[in-house]
Amino acid sequence: MSDDKYHHDKHHDKHHIDSKQSTAAALSSSSTLASSSSMTTTTTTTSTTTTAASPITPKPRKNYPNSADQYELKETIGKGGSGLVQRAICLPFQENVAIKIIDLEHCKNVSLEEIRKEIQAMSLCHHPNVVAYHTSFVYNESLWVIMDFLSAGSCSDIMRFSFPQGFEEHVIATILKEALKAICYFHKTGRIHRDIKSGNILIDSNGNIQLSDFGVSATLIDTGETSRNTFVGTPCWMAPEIMEQVNYDYAVDIWSFGITALELARGKAPFAEYPPMKVLLLTLQNPPPSLEGDGESKWSHSFKDLVEKCLQKDPSKRPLPSKLLEHRFFKQAKKPDYLVQHILAKLPPLGQRYQMLSEDSFAMLRNTSSPQFDTGHSNSADEWIFPNENNDNNNSSTTTTTTTTTTTNPSNNNNNNNNKTKENLTQSPFETPSHTPSTSPGSTPSHSRTSTPTSNHTALGSSSTVVPPPVVPLTLPTAIPVTAAAYHQQQQHHHLSHSSGSIPNHNASSNLGASAHSNVHGLAHSSIHPTSSAASTTVVNNTQQPQTLQPPQQQHQLQQPIKTPSPINAINIVKLNQSDLITPPKTSPKKEGSIPSSSSHGNIPSLVTTSPKSPLQHQQQIPQQQQDPAMINSNNSSISSNGAYNRELISASGSALSKPPSPSSDKENNSTSKSNKSKSRQSSRASSLSESSDSTSHTSSSDEHSSRYESDRKSYKKKKSSSSSSNSKRDRERERDRDRSNKTYKNSRSRNVSRDRERERDRHNRSRDRDRERERERDRDRERDRDRSRDRSRDRSRDRERDRSRDRSRDRDRSRDRSRDRSRERDRDRSRDRSRDRSRSRDSDSRDRSRDRSRSHSNRRRSRSRDSRNKSRDRSSDSDRSRDRSRDRDYKSSKYKKSSRGTSGRKNNKIQSKLDSQATHISYLEDKISTLTNWLQQQNLLNTSNGQVLSPTDPNLVSKLQTQLDVLQSENSYLRNENINLKTIVNGSNSTNNSLNQSSGMAFRNSVSSLHQLNMSNSSNNSRPQTQ
């Protein structure tokens, strides 16, 4: 569309309209359509979207004109369910529109009620995914419906032209998602579409998807019902509940949506190759169709799941459209630009595509002999785009017949279908019966290159002869209605003409209607004997109806394509013109009951179809005697059986019939007396002289002939009476000899004529056989060329399909490889992350364990040291007590001296244990002093590295360390003093105590020196200026 911005702006509302006003508008438009021929329906309802805060006023819609002169029709783009669709230009807006033209007088497939429903549904729909309806009006007994023009056509048309195997999955997801939005809108507004298929899904030039064809949509809001039970839809897409004619609801559109998904995937709907009744049986009896048979790797699991959910025979198990929009399959849907790049970029324009599809389908239909491809009875209501077929108009009140002159062969009837030639068409002057036989494409005769010469002819009496008339154009009399008796007589006449090879003789008193009926029937249904097909002529004579010429306008109206009632036998006019042995019909002497002379009829013109005569043929006709029509009728069967050439003469009443004389009739007529012989010669001379005169001079020539005949007879009597009796015998002998010689001459002449006729017949048969063989050879060559072209086209299509399948397989392989590489990279990254996490967790665990161990060890050491201190303290207190007691006991009596020795040994043991605990505690203090000393040395080294001070030590830290060292020193000195006191008590402990004192003194001295150095460095650092 040229105005895409407006197209989206006028559909920006949320589809909430006043349903009562819209329905009333549609109903009023439909009532006007049924009652008046000047109906004009324009949808002017503007939908509004209101919110709780403030109303939003939409932009005004365009008012399209309601007159046909404001639109310029362009090419045909297809046919819908109820009419022809053409592209047009709206002249006021200069934009493309689609016009559906519906013939209200001859609409066979739809009724006015269906048209009303379709217009009502279109006028109430306003959605970006629904084809927009502008206006409608009546023009020349046709309803014009103006809609948006979607230049890409339907999905079915695109698949038939470029994608016969179906679309890829991304394209299907894009199309189905937009179509599902339109279905959601329909269901929200209380409507059922009931005919969702790819032929009703249209695409514009920008890749936007819209749903069309509301001819079978049902509205549930009008009546307040919750279900429908009408049998509407296309069989392949029809839900099972519609086939069973039970109550159904919105779920039927979900079934059709699933079938449409299969159609877009495979290129055709399930059971599309079967007739409608079998489709109904297969749908009801078989399980629902699915994508399982197409292979596991072709379609994704989400697509299969979508189709399976939609195609549930139980309507309650089918999901809602709003739920289907949330399906994971639609995550692969693309933007409209994707369709433009991958689908619409390589397509020709819609009109050109429609013409190409029409030509291909028409050629396929003509080249096949199957009855299911009959072009005269095709149903074009299925698709938006389909072949251009000539449908018969069964509703017309009158029919027309085709009069053609052909040269055909029964063996090549099927091949003549491909020869497109113009037909000489004339309107029939009578009404054909209601059951008119139709011809199939295989039996349509080809048309000849020559026309049949016609001439006027007048039925003459006894003394009149046939005058060669000039050639005039063939015209038929005016139309005369046919009665029942005339129709019965026509059927009997047709049956006899086909059975015997000649038309029966009827009574001259037949009515005018039967006469006209038989005349035209003789033109259209004349049957010629096989042996005389090249030499027969058809004569039509109007005795009571004057000849009228058709005006140019009427003759132009007669040139319209119609179907011929039956094929017409061949008449080769070239062979007729070249023949020298064809004689015109002879007139017989006037007798009672014979045909009336020209004086009784007057100068009434007639229509004669005959062939020109050669001079030799005219000379041979002069000496022959005239025959009676009764004799000709009696010898008709013998003439046709002997293979002689027939000459048919149809008079005004269809009763007069004359044929050329046979040799047997010549022999009988020549065996008469001498007087009859002279009469025949004189009559032949008179007939030869009268050929150059008109009808008024025939009477005078007949009077001259009679007077001469009387005078010759009188002179002959006188001579005969004056002859002597002596010469009578000799004269009789002479007469006998003359009679014999005349008989032999006539016999030889008749033999020669018959021989010449046989030779000419054989020559004609040979030439006809040669022509037939040539025609057969030509037909064979044409068939060969057609087969070759078909094979080439099939090979090309196969190659194209192979290339497409290869490209698809390559793309699939590439996508698979990419997905595999991506999955492998993901797996590698995951494994790396896992290994890193594991190593980090292991390191952290090991650190935690080591920390825990160190802490546990330190805690254990501290607890041990505390226990040892407590024990040593207890021991020291016990030792002091025991010492005091021992002193007290020493001053007592001597009886306690023995017991004190035993107790002193025990005390020594306790003191030894206390000394051991003090030794361990002293070692712990030394370790702690050494660690502090090492730390101080490291800090000193770091501060004084490379002769520069990196960072000065905090004096608070140094003071804390000093206090800690003091505490340790005091504790150590206390332990040493206690140890000295105890060594006096325990013997042999001097060496260990001295070692302890030396080690503890060295550790203390080291710690004091390191602390002193650290203090010196701090003081030096404080004295220097801080440059960093």
UniProtKB/Swiss-Prot annotation:
InterPro entries linked to this entry: Kinase-like_dom_sf (IPR011009), Prot_kinase_dom (IPR000719), Protein_kinase_ATP_BS (IPR017441), STRAD_A/B-like (IPR047173)
Post-translational modification: Undergoes autophosphorylation in the catalytic domain.
Positions with biased composition (Basic and acidic residues): 701-714, 728-742, 753-855, 865-893
Disordered: annotated span: 1-67, 368-467, 486-561, 580-914
Species classification: Eukaryota, Amoebozoa, Evosea, Eumycetozoa, Dictyostelia
Entry keyword set: ATP-binding, Kinase, Manganese, Metal-binding, Nucleotide-binding, Phosphoprotein, Serine/threonine-protein kinase, Transferase
Low complexity: compositionally biased ranges: 20-54, 387-419, 432-458, 543-561, 617-642, 683-700
This protein's name: Serine/threonine-protein kinase fray2
Protein kinase domain boundaries: 71-330
GO BP: any one term: protein export from nucleus
UniProt biased composition (Polar residues): 368-381, 503-518, 528-542, 595-616
GO MF assignments: ATP binding; metal ion binding; protein serine kinase activity; protein serine/threonine kinase activator activity; protein serine/threonine kinase activity
Binding-site residues for ATP, renumbered to this chain: I77, G78, K79, G80, G81, S82, G83, L84, V85, K100
Catalytic activity, reaction form: L-seryl-[protein] + ATP = O-phospho-L-seryl-[protein] + ADP + H(+); L-threonyl-[protein] + ATP = O-phospho-L-threonyl-[protein] + ADP + H(+)
Catalytic residues of the enzyme: D195
One GO CC term on file: serine/threonine protein kinase complex
Enzyme category, top tier: transferase
Cofactor(s) the protein requires to work: Mn(2+)
One Pfam family from the record: Pkinase
EC number: 2.7.11.1
Highest taxon in the source lineage: Eukaryota
Positions carrying Phosphothreonine: T230
Gene field: fray2
Similarity comment text for this entry: Belongs to the protein kinase superfamily. STE Ser/Thr protein kinase family. STE20 subfamily.
